[in-house]
UniProtKB/Swiss-Prot annotation:
PANTHER family: TRANSMEMBRANE 9 SUPERFAMILY MEMBER 4 (PTHR10766:SF55), TRANSMEMBRANE 9 SUPERFAMILY PROTEIN (PTHR10766). This is Transmembrane 9 superfamily member 11. One of its GO terms (cellular component) is Golgi membrane. Keywords: Endosome, Golgi apparatus, Membrane, Signal, Transmembrane, Transmembrane helix. Its main location: membrane. Residues 313-364, 413-432, 484-515, 569-586, 641-658 are cytoplasmic. Residues 1-23 form the signal peptide.
Length: 658
């Protein structure tokens, strides 16, 4: 009865986590009330493209600049690492004031270099990403009877070898009447940099106000009369009507020609409430396919893992039960006729080769796995919303640094266990644990950063941020890892249940290479996550929104279970054929899933990112994929090793073999 109650509790918990993946989030900022006539300032993020994966500053192209100068918005660590550069723009509106034919500016005449760069950005399908009140602009297009939803709009378009630029923007701002229950101060400005303005002489309830709940844009290419705009100043009305037709283009770009930019804006009252304003971004097309595919994958993998677990437990338990039922004389006689895993009793806990490296990798794997579990759990509960840009990356860095204490503890305690309680060398192991994975990651990211620096991309990590990351590494992560190592050195080591012989036992020749089975074992864990992996890759490289962290958390838990089971089965199989070198094999039995993920990444590059242009972009993609695969290998390998270590210790402590 108790087991049924526990099962029901676990099922309820899983269902609650899955339910949280239906776009639930904590908004990340307070609703901002704008009175009629208040100014709304549009901001712009970096130019992005799925063809190059290299973001560039909005003002790297000949666009209009604000009269007060270009100002960067305050950005967190995660935004900078993601390549976001949010800046002010000259586009401004007045709340609930529809305006049309607004002249923005006339650029200088295009030089040969400016024209070449503009054409290159159009060829590479770069998108402009305006933002209002922290909401990215959405663009709707119709194709084959379907309505497609995009964020941002293209810089321009190429038609029959002629380049056209989108120089007139038609904005629509959806607003919802301010609700008194929100009880927020009147603010003026955008969502991520709002200035609080006290309301003097009147209460909020006396002042009608609105909240921004939607932001749409329609880009148009309109050929302005350059001569008639020379005397116009910014925000003055254009002399003739402008018809914005997104199906036609007329503003071609040529050397020695200037570009005139203009815009119009309309406001529309909407039933969308402020907490639901991100639903349009979170509910992307293909969601039904996503849900059913994930559910089907979970059912199949759970069923298969259950069968493997049942067969495995029955086999081992039957072996142990038969031994325990014998009397002492029969046990002594049976000990003389040992077979299978019982023959390696004197070698099963023999120290593996490169023991310190194994300890370091297991410690780093615990740190990475802990970071992933905590971060995804917080995201599934809604604490890391898309409204708060960069919080996911910032949270990952924070949890990774804090969990350095776990890496040091596990590495050193495992080192002392393998060394039968030896204290010498624990400081070296702790240092290696603090520097192994971060050092490799730093090497990969530095190499990729040089490529981004050479391309003048905003995705390049600034030197000041490099210094901050180094300080976080050596001033927080390393000391915490050493502290964890100290506690690991003070903690009692795990006693082995059997003694190790002085002379190693010879391993019988195998019919097939044992490492071949180890590498093949990664297919089962890969089957648990390859569907989810597609959506994650699409989010990273195709600019799609990913916010089903509830399902991702369930998949992560399932992955941990399957990795443990696969490693247990392979360890038992190796022991049965008298192969006692299980340490590294148990690690790579589950860690080999990283190989299949890297192969999948290459497949995704070839078939899904066909438009990715240039060796620099491909190198960036493969470099980031290698970084991701290394982290996955350490995390999954750690799960397999720790489960196998527990199993072997339990197996040989359950029966006395001398």
């Amino acid at each position: 009865m108790r087991s049924m109650d526990r099962f029901g509790i676990w099922v309820l918990a899983i269902l609650l986590v899955i339910q949280s993946s239906f776009g639930f989030y904590l908004p990340g900022s307070y609703p901002h009330k704008y009175e009629v006539g208040d100014y709304l300032n549009v901001k712009v993020n970096s130019l992005t493209s799925i063809e190059t994966e290299m973001p560039f500053s909005y003002y790297s192209l000949p666009f209009c600049k604000p009269s007060e100068g270009i100002k960067d918005s305050a950005e967190n660590l995660g935004e900078l690492l993601m390549g976001d550069r949010i800046e002010n723009s000259p586009y401004r509106f007045r709340m609930f004031k529809n305006e049309s034919e607004i002249f923005l500016c006339q650029t200088d005449k295009l030089s040969a270099d400016s024209l070449k760069l503009l054409k290159k950005r159009i060829d590479e399908m770069y998108q402009v990403n305006p933002m209002l009140d922290n909401l990215p602009a959405i663009r709707y297009t119709k194709r084959d009877g379907y309505v497609l939803r995009w964020t941002g709009y293209p810089v321009g378009i190429k038609v029959q070898d002629v380049y056209y630029v989108f120089n007139h923007l038609k904005f629509k701002v959806l607003v919802h009447k301010y609700e008194e229950a929100a009880n927020v101060a009147r603010v003026m400005g955008t969502g991520d940099a709002a200035e609080v303005i006290p309301t003097i002489g009147k209460k909020d309830s006396d002042v009608p106000g609105y909240m921004v709940v939607g932001f749409e844009v329609v880009p148009c290419s309109f050929a302005h009369n350059g001569e008639s705009t020379k005397k116009l100043k910014m925000y003055e009305r254009y002399t003739t009507p402008i018809k914005c037709d997104s199906t036609r283009v007329s503003m071609s770009v040529k050397e020695g020609q200037s570009i005139v930019f203009s815009y119009e804006v309309s406001f529309e009252e909407s039933d969308i409430k402020w907490p639901s304003r991100w639903d349009a971004y979170l509910k992307m097309e293909g969601s039904k396919v996503h849900w059913f595919s994930i559910l089907n994958s979970l059912m199949v993998i759970t069923f298969l893992a259950g069968i493997v677990l049942v067969i495995f437990l029955r086999t081992v338990r039957r072996d142990l039960t038969r031994y325990e039922e014998l009397d002492k004389e029969a046990q002594a006689q049976m000990n003389e006729e040992l077979s299978g895993w019982k023959l390696v009793v004197g070698d099963v806990f023999r120290a593996p080769s490169n023991a310190s490296l194994l300890c370091v990798m297991v410690g780093d794997g615990v740190q990475i796995l802990g970071m992933a579990v905590v971060t995804i759990l917080f995201a599934a509960l809604g604490f890391m919303s898309p409204a708060s840009r960069g919080t996911l990356i910032t949270g990952m860095l924070f949890f990774y640094m804090i969990l350095g204490i776990a890496a040091g503890y596990v590495s050193v305690r495992l080192w002392r266990t393998i060394g039968c309680g030896e204290h010498r060398g624990w400081m070296s192991v702790a240092w290696k644990a603090a520097c192994f994975f971060p050092g490799i990651a730093f090497l990969i990211l530095t190499t990729l950063n040089f490529l981004l620096w050479g391309s003048h991309s905003t995705g390049a990590i600034p030197f000041s941020l490099f210094v901050i990351l180094l300080l976080l590494w050596f001033c927080i992560s390393v000391p915490l890892t050493l502290i964890g190592g100290y506690f690991g050195a003070k903690a009692p080591h795990i006693e082995f249940p059997v003694r190790t012989n002085q002379i190693p036992r010879e391993i019988p020749a195998q019919k097939y290479p044992s490492w071949l089975l180890v590498l093949g074992a990664g297919t089962l864990p890969f089957g648990t996550l390859f569907i989810e992996l597609f959506f994650i890759m699409s989010s990273i490289w195709m600019g799609r929104v990913y916010y089903v962290f509830g399902f991702l958390f369930v998949v992560l838990i399932l992955l941990v279970v399957v990795c443990a089971e696969v490693s247990l089965v392979l360890t038992y199989m190796h022991l049965c054929v008298e192969d006692y070198k299980w340490w590294w094999k148990s690690f790579f039995a589950s860690g080999s899933v990283a190989i299949y993920i890297f192969i999948y990444s290459i497949n995704y590059l070839v078939f899904d990112l066909k438009s990715l242009s240039g060796p620099v972009s491909a190198t960036l993609y493969l470099g980031y994929s290698l970084f991701m695969v290394l982290a996955i290998m350490l995390a999954t390998g750690t799960v397999g090793f720790l489960s196998s270590f527990w199993f072997v210790h339990y197996l040989f402590s359950s029966v006395k073999l001398d």
